[in-house]
Amino acid sequence: MTVTRRAFAIVLSPAGLAALVGLAPLPLVGAARAQGTIAELVAKPVSLPDMALGPVKASVTIIEYASMSWSHCAAFEENVFPMLRSKYIDTGKVHFVFREFPLDINAAVVSMLARCVAGDDAGKFFDVIDTLFRQQDALMAQTKESLALIGKKAGLSEQSVETCENDQTRLDKLSADRKFAYEMLKVEATPTFFINGEVRKGSMSFEELDQKIHSLLKE
């Protein structure tokens, strides 16, 4: 199913999300079954390939659902992620996955640009989103000039940036992944974390993550 920008924006609105739930009600499940099912569902990407750092077979896997337009996600990227990466990801103890959950069409376009710039290079992708999060205010104005400037810094021509942000196939996949996360994983806001399949909603400090990871590594 092809999703236009306008349709994508409508789905992201509160009314659109309510309609989505109304059209596709979730089954009632017990807590234990729900947790087990969610842990299985969240383990693999749906449409877009995962962007991840750290060994796949690490003892702890953290999956973050984030929106490029949300300040709490930017704060995590700037204040928490560097310490998490240094202590646990780069040392092979944590496998960290970043998944997009755009809260508005601007975030969706910026996510598409990040993937376009990075290609299949996960390391480059994380460098790109770090840069984009630090320029969040300017990017959310979503002017042609601001996107072109980011693209230029990444080595893309203005035409390439325009092609990236109008990539219908990537937008369809982004929309499908967001819908799956909302309907099946109960992701409703960002950031949302899944730590070895256990959901943690809302911002987490490094101290909270450190304590949780430490407890899992001891098991």
Residue positions per predicted region:
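Structural alpha/beta surface segment adjacent to cysteine/selenocysteine redox centers
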Residues: A66-S69, A74-K152
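A short beta-strand-turn-helix
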Residues: A43-V60
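Extracellular/periplasmic catalytic domains that process cell-envelope and extracellular macromolecules
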Residues: V56, I89-T91, L185-E188
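N-terminal secretory signal peptides and thylakoid transit peptides that target proteins
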Residues: M1-G16
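Sec/Tat signal peptide C-region and signal peptidase I cleavage site
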Residues: P27-A34
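C-terminal cap of thioredoxin/glutaredoxin-like
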Residues: V3-A7, Q35-G36, S67, L149-E219
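Bacterial N-terminal signal peptides
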Residues: S13-P27
